[in-house]
From Swiss-Prot:
Domain of life (superkingdom): Eukaryota
Family as reported in the entry's similarity comment: Belongs to the nicotianamine synthase (NAS)-like family.
Protein name: Nicotianamine synthase-like 5 protein
GO biological process: nicotianamine biosynthetic process
GO molecular function, one term: nicotianamine synthase activity
Organism lineage string: Eukaryota, Viridiplantae, Streptophyta, Embryophyta, Tracheophyta
Miscellaneous notes: Homologous to nicotianamine synthase, but without enzymatic activity.
Species whose genome carries this gene: Hordeum vulgare (Barley)
Amino acid sequence: MEAENGEVAALVEKITGLHAAISKLPALSPSPQVDALFTELVAACVPSSPVDVTKLGPEAQEMRQDLIRLCSAAEGLLEAHYSDMLTALDSPLDHLGRFPYFDNYVNLSKLEHDLLAGHVAAPARVAFIGSGPLPFSSLFLATYHLPDTRFDNYDRCSVANGRAMKLVGAADEGVRSRMAFHTAEVTDLTAELGAYDVVFLAALVGMTSKEKADAIAHLGKHMADGAVLVREALHGARAFLYPVVELDDVGRGGFQVLAVHHPAGDEVFNSFIVARKVKMSA
């Protein structure tokens, strides 16, 4: 226990130092300095760790909340930068590997498909909420794993959707004809949610645990009975980068948890939860 406490203390000290350095940056747009600091931060958070972020002291909790905000802003700028860079190239889909976390998305889409296959037989319609300017998850599922499925991508930012549409426009007709983009907040979606067999909720939808719980409850109110929710989540030290999703919140939202996947190595960064919408009793 003493060794475990020492490991947690050392991790918190390192992340606190990185937070201080990131906070002093003049901007969060991609640059050698920004890239180096966030690469170091991700490397510190990837290894398995005994840390439970819910048990951190008030000062560390305040640091973590601000770090989550900084990571969200930096991730949005990073994705916008690479979306613009890729679409400026001839045959942009041939150069997706330039994105620093490309391999993570390739591996993640395979894992998501493999887990879904045990619970959903060939979904006809899938929604991605929080798809962003680089809709890699839906693009890779549409291209490699679900060739007959239609994908609706939702993001609250119309500029992000414009970038995504431009990128997906370079895909084969058989892929791009099955990919649609809509500008909306998750809470704006009501009746349309009932049409989907699967709904993916991205890690950046909801910047606090309460916002995430509220989003899940909203989906539980409007998704069809038997439909499946896939929620990106974080575990261990990775929870310094995104808010934690509590399984109790998934259950209270009207879902039965079917599977929880936590990555064993560094091939995939995100954990995710697979849950089925249950019929609400009268």
